[in-house]
Amino acid sequence: MDKQEKSLIINEFKKSESDTGSTEVQVALLTARIHQLTTHMIANKHDFHTKRSLLTLVGRRRRLLSYMRNSNGAGYQELIANLGLRK
């Protein structure tokens, strides 16, 4: 993911003008990175280092989504709908 893709994601999910670290932005960035690593893993099945990194990112996203579900239920539902995540 390059700077331009990252800034597009941040602009789409930010709450205010200077927001780059809210939970929504973090989850959106992690989701983009997870999609990127998933396509890499399809082509490179024996890349175990990437597999471990992918599982780490999925766990981090899961913890952030759990926090968001407990603190902001409506925002959680909207975010998973926008990102196309199931639940």
Curated annotation (Swiss-Prot):
Organism phylogeny: Bacteria, Bacillati, Chloroflexota, Dehalococcoidia, Dehalococcoidales
Record-stated family: Belongs to the universal ribosomal protein uS15 family.
A single Gene Ontology CC term: cytosolic small ribosomal subunit
Keyword Nucleotide-binding set for record: no
Keywords: Ribonucleoprotein, Ribosomal protein, RNA-binding, rRNA-binding
GO biological process, one term: translation
Species of provenance: Dehalococcoides mccartyi (strain ATCC BAA-2100 / JCM 16839 / KCTC 5957 / BAV1)
Name of the molecule in the record: Small ribosomal subunit protein uS15
Gene3D superfamilies listed in its UniProt record: 6.10.250.3130, S15/NS1, RNA-binding
Described purpose of this protein according to its UniProt entry: One of the primary rRNA binding proteins, it binds directly to 16S rRNA where it helps nucleate assembly of the platform of the 30S subunit by binding and bridging several RNA helices of the 16S rRNA.
Cross-referenced NCBIfam families: S15_bact (TIGR00952)
Keyword Ribonucleoprotein recorded: yes
Pfam families: Ribosomal_S15
Taxonomy, superkingdom: Bacteria
Single GO MF descriptor: rRNA binding
Subunit relationships: Part of the 30S ribosomal subunit. Forms a bridge to the 50S subunit in the 70S ribosome, contacting the 23S rRNA.
Signal peptide interval: none
